[in-house]
Structure formats: structure tokens, C-alpha cells
């Protein structure tokens, strides 16, 4: 009997979230590139979050921002995103802080900090002292110190010195790059990959790693309980990063909606199901539906 190859199921191209929302009872939504661009929020995305929350279930913002959720909320609000269009925020920065709190529980943690001073509140209140590489027990990578002008290769000497001492890097943002307005900037994930290439040990917090999805689903369940609804059984993950948002959703067993005009915008043309499927195969990530931008 001849072997018959099953047909490839192409992703569904949709014009808005309303076309598939009824199939889901919770939304796990990326932030940067989906609901804001690092400068201002996307009103159509905010409306989509409102509508889903009103009609179908809780909305949890899941971000690889290297900040605690309260700081992420302040930032999102400053960009114009209404805080009542979502139920909770789960951040990689919050998860990384929890790790450092455990490491600093018994004695002062000597930490080599890689990131801008504006993100230092992430470790405020912990028994941590910033230290040079020769004294540090662990390194925290939040991002480049000046992501507007620097690139990861400028950190080669620093990373080699860390590797020589066998320092573990805690990466609070696994994203490689991100859009800020029209610019593409490097994130802490790029530093982490460079450190791994040297043989260094990296502990990642955030997407695509499973624990952050467990935290997001737990937050969705709490929000549902507070609204006297059943715990979500059919959550949908939304994001524009194939290696983080979509691959992470796949690993967590969640259906995914890919936002095509985000970080991969230049790679998503022509905008056809066949091209999207080839893009998914190239990145090893799969979304069941695709839309250009998040809207209802």
C-alpha cells in the first residue's frame, strides 16, 4: 500500500482576534511589539484586549521585560495602555528577581550587574551588593548598558573575564532584539548567547522557557477565580517573536497567534499561508493563526 503524505495544515490568516476568540477562554499576550512599540501603545491592540476580557476570559500580559510587574505596568501606562484592559502582568524580570532573592537569602550576594542604571529597581530591597567580576558570585544581565549605541560584541572582553572565573549569568530578558519605535535594538538574550558561545553557564528567565508560562497560566486562573469563572482550559498565546513567544507557546502546549508585523516584519512577505508555514519551519515554531497586528 502506497504511503500517503498528509497535507500540510497551513496557518489561518485572520483579520482580527474576534475570528478565533470564541475558541479560547484566556489570553496570554506579549507586550513589546504587540501592545506597544517601546514609545506608545497600539489603541487597536488595547481594544482587542478589552473585548476579549469582557467576552471570553482573563488577559495576562507576559513579557520578557527585565523589570518587576509593577514597573512594567508603570511603563505600559506611560505609553498610554489602559491598565484595565488586562488582569495581570507576568515578567521575566520578576522571575529573575525571585531567583536572586533565593541566592541572597542566607548571605549578601556579590553580583556583577550588566544593564542600564534605570533597571536597578529590579534588585532593590534584596541583600545584594554590586561587585566587579573578580569578586562576583553571579552576574545579572538585564540588557546592554546603552542599547541605543552599543552592540553585544562590545562586551567580548567582559564576558571572557566572567567565563574565566566560571560566573553563572542570570538572564532577565531572553529576547535577542526588540523594536523601539523604528529602531531595532539588542537585548540581554544577545549577551547570553554570546556568553554561552564562550562556554559560559546561563540561567534564563522568560519566554520561551516553560516556567514563565506556568506562572502566566496560574495568574490567569487566579483572575478567573476572582471573576467567579472556571479555570481556563483553552488559553491562546499571542506574540510576534517566533523564537520566544511562539516557540514558548509550543513548548507549553498552547495554541498561538503570530503577529506578523512585529519583530519579524521584514521576513513575513509575501503575506501568504504558504510563506508563513515556510517561515515557521525555518524557526522551528508553529502558530495556528496569523494576523498582521493585534486588533479585534
Question: Which residues are covered by each model-predicted region?
Answer:
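Asp-based, Mg2+/Mn2+-dependent phosphohydrolase catalytic module
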Residues: 2-31, 36-57, 62-65, 70-90, ...
Amino acid at each position: 500500500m502506497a504511503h500517503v503524505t498528509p497535507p500540510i495544515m497551513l496557518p489561518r490568516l485572520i483579520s482580527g482576534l474576534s475570528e478565533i476568540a470564541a475558541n479560547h477562554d484566556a489570553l496570554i499576550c506579549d507586550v513589546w511589539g504587540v501592545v506597544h512599540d517601546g514609545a506608545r501603545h497600539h489603541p487597536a491592540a488595547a481594544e482587542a484586549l478589552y473585548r476579549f476580557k469582557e467576552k471570553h476570559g482573563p488577559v495576562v500580559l507576559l513579557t520578557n521585560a527585565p523589570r518587576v510587574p509593577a514597573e512594567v505596568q508603570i511603563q505600559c501606562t506611560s505609553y498610554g495602555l489602559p491598565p484595565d484592559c488586562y488582569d495581570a502582568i507576568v515578567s521575566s524580570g520578576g522571575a529573575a528577581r525571585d531567583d536572586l532573592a533565593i541566592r541572597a537569602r542566607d548571605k549578601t550576594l556579590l553580583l556583577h550587574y550588566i544593564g542600564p542604571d534605570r533597571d536597578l529597581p529590579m534588585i532593590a530591597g534584596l541583600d545584594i551588593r554590586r561587585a566587579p567580576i573578580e569578586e562576583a558570585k553571579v552576574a545579572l544581565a538585564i540588557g546592554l548598558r546603552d542599547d541605543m549605541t552599543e552592540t553585544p560584541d562590545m562586551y567580548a572582553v567582559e564576558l571572557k573575564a566572567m567565563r574565566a572565573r566560571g560566573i553563572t549569568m542570570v538572564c532577565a530578558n531572553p529576547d535577542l532584539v526588540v523594536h523601539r519605535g523604528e529602531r531595532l535594538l539588542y537585548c540581554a538574550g544577545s549577551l547570553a548567547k554570546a556568553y554561552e558561545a564562550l562556554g559560559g553557564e546561563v540561567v534564563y528567565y522568560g519566554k520561551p522557557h516553560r516556567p514563565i508560562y506556568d506562572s502566566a497560566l496560574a495568574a490567569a486562573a487566579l483572575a478567573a477565580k476572582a471573576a467567579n469563572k472556571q479555570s481556563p482550559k483553552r488559553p491562546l498565546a499571542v506574540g510576534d517573536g517566533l523564537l520566544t513567544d511562539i516557540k514558548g507557546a509550543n513548548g507549553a502546549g498552547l495554541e498561538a497567534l503570530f503577529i506578523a508585523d512585529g519583530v519579524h516584519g521584514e521576513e513575513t512577505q509575501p503575506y501568504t499561508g504558504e510563506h508563513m508555514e515556510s517561515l515557521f519551519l525555518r524557526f522551528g515554531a508553529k502558530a495556528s493563526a496569523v494576523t498582521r497586528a493585534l486588533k479585534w
